[in-house]
């Protein structure tokens, strides 16, 4: 499945990629989310019939990734939808087309599977990510995300 273009090779992720994903994420967020990445990769690779998570390499070095999943019928949606959970690009490789290459491959793969929509969420203050996704064709979805804070219950 490896596909090379403009010096970027896009391939399927493996469990061995987890430590590198954690380091990239930590460089971006300042947090260590080892358990999250290990769990996410394990579910994507071992518990799913279809793997849609991809990695991008430059000179054999993993410099970016997209992690996602397919959902069938959640939240009253009759058709399948792909969810983009994470897009990572090593800060040292930012603005070199890594994210674009990953999304281009991901969307092509999803279309081949008959998936018509890819959805993600962006924090309101992640302006760079929002602009990047807008440039890639993402638009606000006709959905309202609701949240209930589960702090201490009143007595």
Name the predicted role of every residue range.
Residues 89, 95-108, 135:
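Conserved acetyl-CoA-binding loop-helix of GNAT-fold acetyltransferases
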Residues 110-122:
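Conserved GNAT acetyl-CoA-binding A-motif
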